[in-house]
Structure formats: structure tokens, C-alpha cells
């Protein structure tokens, strides 16, 4: 989901 895209790092 786009909302969890920042959790990639």
C-alpha cells in the first residue's frame, strides 16, 4: 500500500 511505502527503510 502507498501508505506503507515509507516503511521500506
Curated annotation (Swiss-Prot):
One of its GO terms (biological process) is neuropeptide signaling pathway. In larvae, expressed in the CNS and thoracic perisymapthetic organs (tPSO) but not in the ring gland or abdominal perisymapthetic organs (aPSO) (at protein level). In adults, expressed in brain and thoracic-abdominal ganglion but not in corpora cardiaca and corpora allata (at protein level). Signal peptide: none annotated. The modification Phenylalanine amide is found at residue 9. The keyword Secreted applies. The keyword Secreted applies. Keywords: Amidation, Neuropeptide, Secreted. Its main location: secreted. One of its GO terms (cellular component) is extracellular region. Transmembrane segments: none annotated. It comes from the Eukaryota. It is found in: Secreted. FMRFamides and FMRFamide-like peptides are neuropeptides. Belongs to the FARP (FMRFamide related peptide) family. This is FMRFamide-like neuropeptide TPGQDFMRF-amide. It comes from Delia radicum (Cabbage root fly).
Amino acid at each position: 500500500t502507498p501508505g506503507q511505502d515509507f516503511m521500506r527503510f
